[in-house]
Amino acid sequence: MARAAGTTIDCVALQSLHQHSAPILDADAVRLLHGEKSEQLAQHLKFTDDIASRTSAAITDSLKQLQPVTKIVGSKAKVDRVAANRRVPQPDGSIAVRASVTREAAVRDAPEGLIDPWLRTLTFFDGDRKLVQLHYYATHPQTFYGDARVSWDSVGIARGRMEKSSGVFQIYFTGCGGNVTMGKYNDGNRESRELMATRLLDAMQRSSSADADSIANTVDVASLKPSNIQWDSAPIEFTVREEGTFNPELLKTQLDPDQPFTTRLTAAMFSGFGQRLRDGYIAQATRLRIGNIDVVNLPGEPFVEFQLFAQQVAVKDSFICVAGYGECGVWYYGPDSIFTDRGGYEQTWSLTGPCQQKVEEALTTLLVRETLPKQEIRSK
């Protein structure tokens, strides 16, 4: 992708939708499960290469069709009854889990909890003509899954309908939805999928309209200086977990062929990413700045707290859009308190130790407006 765009790999941000009804790409886990010379790995790598090739070809073609941009508008609208926090505090101090489908009434009917209720939209214009719209919203994007069919789910349905009705190319990004689901309002059936899609589409339309809930920012491209357009990155050094279910020796025993496949699969994913960290892998957070618009791209499944932190640390007149689900090998990460909570789900699939300070430092570094420290940031 970087070669096709004529840039370097640190200037590429690749985010996933995370809708669950889709393949997981994890070559390290496949190697551990099936071996280096296995047909499964060969097919896995072939599929990955095909995705990379088709995406790169599309990038090459797009460079032949560049169009001028005269202004960029940042707007937002509140989403009605879609998202709710997955971690539901209980009277005894424990944390209950409100999954994407929740049958237990007391958990399902609890208050929404901490979310970011706003869907944010970036609209790129050539004169009065809309060229493309990017939408950002923080929730797990699935209503139901596991029936062996690939689906773009409710968010994809909303995006597709928005594109059809507007005639404008639409892109949807999942924000920091690690601890946010549709479980309060979703019954896990086709009717609920349709309802969630309808509510998301309504927010997209309101955010895109002239009477949007909030026209937050307009960038006049002609007034920009070269220094007003920046791409920067900051490292997030996730740490290996080796306690409890993440113990390397325990994971080795769980990879035994006699173990149930789901046990082996989990052990392979845990072991594969843990080894990547031991080998020195460092994840990156990136930020595109165009005038007073900042677009942040984060790895893994970040908690909504980090999206809200980004909005707080940015200067007052900035319009902030945050996309999660970049490098997803780390799975979940959130406030350090999740590691001492009683109950909850996300920390059982967090492949990093406490990292709140590191993530907040990366966001602060990317979102300040002063001169950026050269050892941490590379501007392109």
Residue ranges of model-derived segments:
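Non-catalytic substrate/cofactor recognition surfaces at enzyme active-site rims
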Residues: 1-380
